[in-house]
Amino acid sequence: MTDRHELILTCPKGLEGLLLEEATALGLEEGREQTSAVRGYGALEVGYRLCLWSRLANRVLLVISRFPTVDAETLYQGVHAVDWAEHLLPSGSLAVEFSGRGSGIDNTHFGALKVKDAIVDRLRSASGERPSIDKLDPDLRVHLRLDKGQAVLSLDLSGHSLHQRGYRLQQGAAPLKENLAAAILIRAGWPRIAAAGGALTDPMCGVGTFLVEGAMMAADIAPNLKRERWGFSAWLGHVPALWNRLHADAQARAEAGLARPPLWIRGYEADPRLIQPGRNNIERAGLSSWIRIYQGDVGSFEPRPDQNQKGLVICNPPYGERLGDEASLLYLYQNLGERLRQACLGWEAAVFTAAPDLGKRMGIRSHKQYAFWNGALPCKLLLIKVELDQFVTGQRAGSTEPQPQQAPVEQARLSEGGQMFANRLQKNLRQLGKWARREGIECYRLYDADMPEYALAVDLYRDWVHVQEYAPPRSIDPDKAQARLLDALAAIPQALGIAREKVVVKRRERQSGTRQYERQASQGEFLEVSEGGVKLLVNLTDYLDTGLFLDHRPLRLRIQREAAGKRFLNLFCYTATATVHAAKGGARSTTSVDLSRTYLDWARRNLSLNGFSDRQRLEQGDVMAWLEADRGEYDLIFIDPPTFSNSKRMEGVFDVQRDHVALLDLAMARLATGGTLYFSNNFRKFVLDASLMDRYAVEEITASTLDEDFRRNPRIHRAWKLQAR
């Protein structure tokens, strides 16, 4: 075999340029970038060195043949032509990886089988023995890539992917691969900072990947020094003496690096469950004397060991996948920016984010941005110099520079639109707050798309804020809509003086007549609120709605006033808040019907919270079917149906516009002489069927069912009072 080989280094998408620089420094010649790979030439020693020292590659492939292929047979013949006895003992084990399509091979599994058959047949024809297949830990891992009729046949020198350094046996929910973390550190300038004796800190360190990779760079430790099993370990072309020399040299460099005074490397993690796994990973990497991890959140991390120390703050904030994450992530970025301005003046910072728009909310400009991919997710690396002239808030360049401990910390400056939104909230709070205090109301709507460009509903639940974003029409640029949402979320805590963690945000789609809302998350946290002398449970996080329809407050209070001594029926009862009011008002009995077991359980809790249980009947069922079967009489009926509903537990689909006549006829058949039925719904295009007025005394009462907080939006619902003629 020649001692000059074609080598292909694979890597995550976006790392090709960095990998080319690294591989060239390690001896690769004539290197050039390909998609998710670097190709070049070098002696076997270069291949070994790349396996040992590359912080960025996934695999090091040694090309043993290139040949044209037009079909499965020419693929087989091209692989069969290789003298496999030079590479693998007939009694050894083999794994084949196949990528690409073409030449009549559109199935990678079929392609891998043809490659395997060719290797096995060649070895068996020479010795009578055949190798076994071991996909997990083979003696030889063969890779074939098919591209535009050209087959590239390689041996995988690395074995398992090189990002698997061996120290990270425990990890968090969404870890960065080690080679991606190393690439981010290199782009952030950590090798330069480390060479100058700088510090490294990660305020959201998870299980410490950035910290370990950074410490290995600073201590001159080869990333795969501790790997015991390689793709070349049982390869017949392996030269142990050459490998042992390179490994011994790397071992000596690591020992010398660790003998130097350690740099100041610290991590902080808010989740206590990740602290010990992170420490275990650090210990496995042999870096316990270099790295410390502490429990702490972004707002309290202390990156500065002394007033003169400078360094790099690096982090990978969570991406956010649940409903309401926009608010928590916005405030996380704001907290990070505040802490950088407060404690890290003169430092550099690197924020790896899948939401670069949130990066703008930190209040510090980034001077460079790099595109990366985390798997299939496009991300940006924001590089920041924590200097006064980079602050979006606080003092500008030319001002007298304070001492580091006096660095200004201010709330993120609001945009012009954000300030207008904040002013509107404060104006509404002055007006509605006075009314709410006078009426003893704890929960009310503060803002309802008063400014068209900020299409939100903002509700107060005691000292919590519940924000619903109306989905923008297709004519609105989604990026502009997202920017306005972030402006609003930045303004709300400042305008209302409410802690950021008490702001919950959700998105509400415009009603189409075909949508209904499902459970959004599962936190199970309930808040007790009061209304009209009753206590009610709301859940601000788990569902699109909270368990309490604020716009129906006047109707619930009317029911409480009229319920004394009456038999009350609540259809589509939801969490039975109207039932609680009826019971409070002295109803002789109550019956509440809903299809959802979850909401009926919630209703039971609402009733129990107020001491009601004996005479309160909760029925699970399809309301239409239940009414057809029921033979009871009721003096007071309340119906607030959804616009649209379907379920496995009901026959057909309920549509309020189509089905309201049948619904009201069934309900009026159950109304006792002299009784009253209240009907309300929130479908904006709803039209009450005129034929109902021929059969019943019908009075629209919408105006009297709107309190001060909903008079700006008189179409929030419509309501009618029905009685027998």
UniProtKB/Swiss-Prot annotation:
GO terms for molecular function: 23S rRNA (guanine(2445)-N(2))-methyltransferase activity; RNA binding; rRNA (guanine-N7-)-methyltransferase activity. Keywords: Cytoplasm, Methyltransferase, RNA-binding, rRNA processing, S-adenosyl-L-methionine, Transferase. This is Ribosomal RNA large subunit methyltransferase K/L. Its EC number is 2.1.1.173, 2.1.1.264. It is an enzyme of class 2 (transferase). The gene is rlmL. It comes from Stutzerimonas stutzeri (strain A1501). It is found in: Cytoplasm. Residues 46-157 form the THUMP domain. SUPFAM superfamilies: S-adenosyl-L-methionine-dependent methyltransferases.
